[in-house]
Amino acid sequence: MDSQPLVVYCTCLDQATAERIAETMVNERLAACVTVAPGLTSIYRWQGQIQRDAEVLLIIKTRSAVYPLLEARIHDLHPYEVPEIIALPIQAGSATYLNWIADNTGASA
């Protein structure tokens, strides 16, 4: 593998937005897989007020080599002024799965 595998978390306001972003990430090879997890509640401070919103979580499997493009593309597609985009390195995992992530992100073979 030529770069670190990552899991990226991104929350969305609804299922349709989440699926649109997920499909774009996979179609553009910025992610090998995106899990769309509905039914979350986020509690946060925004403009001095405590907010509580239903959200949908994207769990994006990708590589550090394409992360800058993935982050920029999420900003292009996401309706939030400050979308949650958090990338975490995958420290260990199934070698076959990690190789699959590498094979399905970046330039097509």
Task: Give the residues covered by each predicted segment.
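Positively charged, small/polar-rich N-terminal and surface patches that mediate targeting and assembly
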Residues: 1-109
